[in-house]
């Protein structure tokens, strides 16, 4: 009977001991660059759109945006990765669209294949 009780208890203890590193506030974030896998320009009806494909780490970092454990520079690092892959994205309004996706895409539509940025959209600043 002891063996029957000890085995499940040992299994439970090992599971409880396997807490992810992110659960320890002193260990830092559980994500790291690269945040962007690749980008791709596409055209629909004469309008261009930049598809940004985040990495799993990018998705994790974006979900942390605005929380106590978040890296406040993560969105800037990710935007730098976008510009490294698609320098033409450096136009008015594109960074604001990216930051909007960074903050809300994984909440509104988790796991969406790409975050789509459109340079033809009106420029909206943070105050709007």
PLM region spans:
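N-terminal prepro-regions of secreted/extracellular proteins
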Residues: 1-39
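A broad, low-specificity signal marking well-ordered, structured residues that form hydrophobic/aromatic
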Residues: 21, 50-51, 115
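Charged, amphipathic alpha-helical regulatory modules used
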Residues: 39, 48-52, 56, 124-128
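Extracellular/periplasmic catalytic domains that process cell-envelope and extracellular macromolecules
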Residues: 44
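Acidic/histidine-rich, surface-exposed loop or edge segments in extracytoplasmic proteins
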Residues: 48-87
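Extracytosolic low-complexity repeat regions of secreted or lipid-anchored proteins
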Residues: 78-128
């Amino acid at each position: 009977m002891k063996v029957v009780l000890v085995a499940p208890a040992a299994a439970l203890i090992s599971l409880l001991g396997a807490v992810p590193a992110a659960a320890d506030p002193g260990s830092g974030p559980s994500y790291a660059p690269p945040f962007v896998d690749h980008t791709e320009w596409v055209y629909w009806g004469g309008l261009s759109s930049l598809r940004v494909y985040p990495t799993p780490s990018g998705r994790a970092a974006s979900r942390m945006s605005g929380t106590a454990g978040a890296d406040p520079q993560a969105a800037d690092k990710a935007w730098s990765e976008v510009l490294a892959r698609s320098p033409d994205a450096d136009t008015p309004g594109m960074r604001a669209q990216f930051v909007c996706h960074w903050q809300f895409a994984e909440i509104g539509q988790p796991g969406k294949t790409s975050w789509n940025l459109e340079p033809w959209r009106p420029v909206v600043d943070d105050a709007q």
